[in-house]
Amino acid sequence: MDIELVAQTRTKSGKGPARALRRNEMVPAVLYGPKAETVSLSVPRQRLERLLRDMGEESKLLRLTVEGDGTAEMKQVLIREVQVHPVRRRFLHVDFYEVPLDHPIVVEVPVELLGEPVGVKKGGTLNLIQRMLSVRCLPGEIPEKVQVDVSKLDIGSSIQVEQLRTIVPFELTDDGGMAVVNVVAPEGAGKEDAEAAEE
């Protein structure tokens, strides 16, 4: 599915013009990248809100059409940062990063767990420690999920990034020793074992 958004160039900056944009249901934005000049933009608030809701936590390429001075130019971008008012929860600003399609980038990709762990069947608890992992890939090859098979995970065991590197078809850039998911003993199990040993 193509994800598209139309932005307008803007020449005025500062708090006053930014507030005026928000009153008109527009969100101030900026476009930048390694091969592009920084451009100030504005985007429709409702369209941005719907787009972010549909995207969820996934890092996806966005087709941003930049309109201004009677011209329109399409850019391939990622959303790098969205600033939200801490109380009113309205959008304050958004950063778009223009990506060269032939240059690898690092993005955050959500983790998806597959299967029921052996340890859970024994009464243990499954803990997802890292909900997102860093992936290096070309912009057109961003995976939707990092799938992790946890069916063989027993109580007291974990799966680390290093173990996933031999399984997934893309590069993981997080520390190899970082635990992604584990299964822990049921609460109170250690106490019960100690009491049984004393008896």
From Swiss-Prot:
> Biological process GO terms, please?
translation
Question: SUPFAM superfamilies from the xrefs?
Answer: Ribosomal protein L25-like
Specify the superkingdom: Bacteria
> Entry's Gene3D superfamilies?
Ribosomal protein L25, beta domain, Ribosomal Protein L25, Chain P
Alphabetical keyword list: Ribonucleoprotein, Ribosomal protein, RNA-binding, rRNA-binding
Which protein family is it in? Belongs to the bacterial ribosomal protein bL25 family. CTC subfamily.
Xref: NCBIfam families: bL25_bact_ctc (TIGR00731), PRK05618.4-2 (NF004139), PRK05943.1 (NF004612)
Kindly state the subunit structure of this protein: Part of the 50S ribosomal subunit; part of the 5S rRNA/L5/L18/L25 subcomplex. Contacts the 5S rRNA. Binds to the 5S rRNA independently of L5 and L18.
The entry's function note states: This is one of the proteins that binds to the 5S RNA in the ribosome where it forms part of the central protuberance.
Instruction: State what protein this is by name.
Output: Large ribosomal subunit protein bL25
